[in-house]
């Protein structure tokens, strides 16, 4: 709790600073003259007249396949807004949008190989990943925690010592857990699962004592599942997760175009409507998320 209070205090301070910048910008009458955007990813999109977006259909409510067979979700909807603005930003008359399905491993390959221009799921922005990929403005913040069985005498993080823990492979939570165990910060046996569904089955069958993962992903994919009535989540979070849209590092101007659309969207009621659509039944946006949107709504 102290950690999140510190973050909140810093963001509120940043809010005050940003408000001052916005007011100053509003008083400025300087013309905004921009050169045409260019770069390798932008050129690829222009040449193909197509924006290719990767998404993981197993990361609801951030990315999933809807009943109509089309991609949907909180991050997917943000990327649809980005796509709608790219036509104008790149001065194109026509641009198709192509969606490809990926998973927790192939999403990185899709961006690195150039098969996809954007990755729109629930990808965490970390310092390690920034060495290989570029990330947009932060789109969501949440904490990682543990899901346990209702009948288990496990109430807090300390109770997980010497227990068997499941985690979805190729995720930041998996990496964090491996580091914590290797450094001696946590004593536990880690078992990797291919998905939250597989991890949920392990927990139900008592093959593991808990599942580690991002809180909202676990709530949506485990607690809401047919096995969900048998599980609960611990109240404590052990790590923050900062989600963002992932893309190639080779094109800073493409990243700027994505960020410009996100920042402008954060100024409007649209972002609140998206939040309510995908998370309204789970929780209301707290001060942390409100500050996140406010501090990234940069002036022109």
Model-identified regions with their sequence ranges:
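Bilobed "Venus flytrap"/periplasmic-binding protein-like clamshell domains
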Residues: 55-61, 71-88, 124, 142-196, ...
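Extracytoplasmic small-molecule ligand-binding "clamshell" domains
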Residues: 28-119
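Short helix-initiation/N-cap motifs at beta->coil->alpha
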Residues: 38, 92-109, 152, 190-202, ...
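A ligand-binding cleft/hinge motif common to bilobed small-molecule-binding domains
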Residues: 106, 120-132, 176-183, 204-239
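Ligand-binding clefts/hinges and TM-proximal coupling segments of bilobed small-molecule sensing domains
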Residues: 28-36, 175-191, 229-231, 262-300
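Periplasmic-binding protein-like
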Residues: 57, 140-151, 215, 223-263, ...
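Acidic, polar ligand-binding/catalytic clefts
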Residues: 80, 84, 91-159, 298-300
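Extended ligand-binding regions for polar small-molecule ligands
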Residues: 27-42, 77-85, 151-154, 158-164, ...
